Amino acid sequence: MDKDLLISNIKKMKKEQNAVIVAHSYQVDEVQEIADVTGDSLALSQFCASSQADTIVFCGVHFMAESAKLLSPEKTVLLPEINAGCPMADMVTAEALKEAKKKYPHAAVVCYINSSAEVKAECDICCTSSNAEKVIRSIDKKDIIFAPDKNLGSYVAKKVPEKNIIFWEGYCITHHKIKKDAVIESKRLHPDAILLVHPECRPEIQELADFVGSTKQIIDYARNSEHDKFIIGTEMGVLYQLKKENPNKTFYMMSTGLICPNMKKTSLQSVHDALAKRQYEITLDSGIIERASGSLNRMLAVGK
């Protein structure tokens, strides 16, 4: 089926099923083009929580679709590519987190949204890269277990030094592989460019950046900045929105290897098939929904 026919069919089925298509900023361009909303994990969570649609087609990875189901359990949530997972999310399990809670019984537990529903059920509150600092500041306790991303945890620890952050040993394999030498070389090649990186990068990479922020914050920074040249230190899918909003600005990827294979699995065909076959539906145990949705709703109550 050619692209135009796929898009036409998607629009038709979406209307018939009262469905919305949400896409993370790391999705391929053609998927972002047909989405009703694009953004980072926080923006998409907020959208799903308030959506009046009956069906949410979530173009992202598994934990994101689970989060949409947790926030809107009465809705049908479809994940076009059921094997689109997240290695970082797999680096923490509910069982391991339970053991950490026994080791630090007086600590609060914050989990990055990049985690399974079962893990979210064991934590006090969730966060995203957009609101991690605000979430940490909202917690009364001094000791905080932060899972699974140690790089985001390190970033927050510097912002909120009065807290004792207990790091998990997790990381994003795409951001974590950025090396200091590559950053220095990028800055040498583009001396007039501003370096924007994601807090999932290693601390030594964050220190070299002119700005550290989530994908949405990076997009906002580039839009509002007077500068016209930027080096981008996050997954390359963000270039779609950056170039769309800033046609007269120049963006250089820090590395051509900044690709999340799981985010790239979703295609127009798989979005079409998700609607046509009503696949793949996210289902969660009612007990998990009750416990895990609380951590997400507490995050949303804290705000952006």
From Swiss-Prot:
Cofactor: [4Fe-4S] cluster
Top-level taxon in the UniProt lineage: Bacteria
EC number: 2.5.1.72
GO terms of molecular function: 4 iron, 4 sulfur cluster binding; metal ion binding; quinolinate synthetase A activity
Metabolic or biological pathway, per its Swiss-Prot or TrEMBL entry: Cofactor biosynthesis; NAD(+) biosynthesis; quinolinate from iminoaspartate: step 1/1
Cofactor binding remark: Binds 1 [4Fe-4S] cluster per subunit.
One of the GO biological process terms: 'de novo' NAD biosynthetic process from L-aspartate
Protein name, UniProt field: Quinolinate synthase
